Amino acid sequence: MKQHAYEVTLKHIADDQGNPSTYTDTLSFNSYNHDDIFKVLQVIQNSQMLDDEAAKSFAVGLKLFSEVMLEHKHLPLFKDFMPHFGQFMKALKQTVKTQSQS
């Protein structure tokens, strides 16, 4: 299957108390997805169901998680979760469609 390729970089900037991070390294890895994550983000942003920062976190997190789950759907953890995730995705698509039409 052809997939979009991404480089994901994560940098810790502050702890849960607002103090500057003590981590000096960034986490960087390559990830692949059957969807164009930027297009997914655009759809979520256009729906205005979340503020811009939340939309970015949600779109990226959702697509990274879902691709790993699909690639490892034979594992019991993911196999048991797949029907629930399918329901969630249907609800999300309906919500985005409804919000975009408003």
Predicted features along the sequence, with ranges:
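N-terminal intrinsically disordered, cationic/polar leader segments
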Residues: 1-52, 76, 80-102
